Amino acid sequence: MATPTRRLEKFRSAIHEFPRVVSTTQKLLRAAQLLDIPVFATTQLRDKLGETCPELGLDAPDGIQTKAHVDKSAFSMFVPELKKAFYELGEEKREVVVVGIESHICVTQTLDLLREGHKVYVIADAVSSCNAQEVPVALARLRAEGAVVTTSESFLYECMGDAGIKEFKGVAGIVKEFNKATRENLEALCKM
């Protein structure tokens, strides 16, 4: 039996440009902390496929604290346990940002958030699949179904809305820090 770390490393090497997905996700998570955006995470069959990547720092003592970090077998992330935690924030419709793998399976099946009336952003430089060719097909479907397919930087500036907010300087600093990685991530993951 493979250890969770070995399973993660094997899975990591199978995903097209996986380190770039992680890099963009790290940028978004850091900005989420500054902007007080709640974070929800899921892991697909933790016992079989391993833990969510440790470098994201999810629920680590000095890391990103999630509202819920749920293990699941369903392909959508919007499983009952996560849905319960999500609606503990209130019943109003929300804007939801989706990142992760695999774009044509778990990311696409999270369209059920749209059916619940939420606005869904899929971050093109933070999703991928084992087969790179699946990604543009999945993003086209997501867009056709009503999701906003955008980039991490575009989303962050839309989220802030105004350079006059107190968090602007901190988020702009994160964007600047990740500038080179963002350019490389876009070149690798956003071939439309």
What are these regions (language model features)?
Residues 14-41, 46:
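A short alpha/beta connector and helix-capping loop motif
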Residues 1-2, 23-27, 109-113:
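Short hydrophobic/aromatic-rich motifs at helix boundaries and adjacent loops
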Residues 2-4, 39-41, 98, 122:
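Structural beta-sheet core signal
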Residues 1-13:
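Generic N-terminal amphipathic, Lys/Arg-enriched alpha-helix
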Residues 12-15, 130:
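A generic structural signal for short coil/turn motifs at secondary-structure boundaries
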Residues 35, 47-192:
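Active-site-adjacent betaalpha module
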Residues 7, 27-31, 117, 146:
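Amphipathic, alpha-helical segments enriched in basic
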